[in-house]
């Protein structure tokens, strides 16, 4: 019974990929196609009811190159409607800033808890850039995209969890993705292990579709990170 209660608690928090309380997070990533590393530092707070906010700062580093600032971002979400104890409807949004300009996104999450050990979140998101880029016709326009994401959350044990996360992107205006088409996929596999009430390390394997421009190869990425909860 104790194990079952633990799984129920973990299911509720993994549905939004967070645990309640304030935390700091550090993550390092390596892209095998571009030979680029990314360093991320994040602080955040998640309430018991599921609302949360986080601030993110990243830097990138390529071989024989200097460390460069990636982006700053602030994101928040709120569980607006819970018609049943299994179904949650949650809007969210974010704004970001990088050297080329600023942008943001709005999204709507629908989460359903099928069992104590499995729940699914479907996310509809619109990504907007406040700056203009040159499109396929040589005109200046905003390279915005529509995104559909799924989060398949599995509770393996009271400490170990796994998330399968496929995302589909479609470019709204006349722009191609790095694979040479108007649409692309990004797939993430996340493995988490809860050491204790403070430490939550994780490991991610990602496929970011094929790059036909600079690298002419599949974009695979490895991420290693950890959260510390206060």
Swiss-Prot record:
Q: Which GO terms describe its molecular function?
A: porin activity
Where it sits in the cell: the answer is: Cell outer membrane
Single GO cellular component term = pore complex
Q: Does the keyword Kinase apply?
A: no
Q: Which InterPro entries does the entry mention?
A: Bact_OM_Channel_sf (IPR053713), Oligogalacturonate-sp_porin (IPR009331)
Q: Does the keyword Signal apply?
A: yes
| Entry membrane topology | Multi-pass membrane protein
Tell me which positions the record assigns to the signal sequence.
Answer: 1-20
Q: What keywords are annotated for this sequence in UniProt?
A: Cell outer membrane, Ion transport, Membrane, Porin, Signal, Sugar transport, Transmembrane, Transmembrane beta strand, Transport
- GO terms for biological process, alphabetical: monoatomic ion transport; oligosaccharide transport
Instruction: Report the function annotation for this chain.
Output: Outer membrane channel protein that allows an efficient diffusion of low-molecular-weight solutes such as small sugars and tetraglycine. However, the specific substrate recognized by the OmpL channel is unknown.
PANTHER family, per this entry? N-ACETYLNEURAMINIC ACID OUTER MEMBRANE CHANNEL PROTEIN NANC-RELATED, OUTER MEMBRANE PROTEIN-RELATED-RELATED
Family the UniProt entry places it in: Belongs to the oligogalacturonate-specific porin KdgM (TC 1.B.35) family. OmpL subfamily.
What NCBIfam families does the record point to? PRK09980.1
Q: What is this protein identified as?
A: Porin OmpL
- The scientific name of the source species is Salmonella typhi
């Amino acid at each position: 019974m104790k194990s079952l209660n633990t799984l129920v608690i973990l299911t509720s928090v993994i549905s939004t990929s967070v645990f309640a309380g304030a935390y700091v997070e550090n993550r390092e990533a390596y892209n095998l196609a571009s030979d680029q590393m990314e360093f991320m530092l994040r602080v955040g707070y998640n309430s018991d009811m599921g609302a949360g906010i986080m601030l993110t700062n990243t830097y990138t580093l390529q071989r024989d190159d200097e460390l460069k600032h990636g982006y700053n971002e602030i994101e928040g979400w709120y569980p607006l409607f819970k018609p049943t104890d299994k179904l949650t409807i949650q809007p969210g949004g974010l704004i970001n800033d990088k050297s080329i300009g600023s942008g943001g996104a709005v999204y709507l999450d629908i989460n359903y808890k099928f069992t104590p050990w499995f729940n699914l979140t479907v996310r509809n998101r619109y990504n907007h850039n406040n700056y203009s880029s040159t499109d396929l016709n040589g005109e200046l326009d905003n390279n915005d995209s529509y995104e559909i994401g799924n989060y398949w959350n599995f509770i393996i044990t009271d400490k170990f969890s796994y998330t399968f996360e496929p995302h589909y992107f479609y470019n709204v205006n006349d722009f191609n993705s790095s694979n040479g088409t108007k649409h692309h996929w990004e797939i993430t596999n996340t493995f988490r292990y809860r050491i204790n009430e403070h430490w939550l390390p994780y490991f991610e394997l990602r496929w970011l579709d094929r790059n036909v421009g600079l690298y002419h190869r599949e974009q695979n990425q490895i991420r290693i990170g950890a959260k510390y909860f206060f």
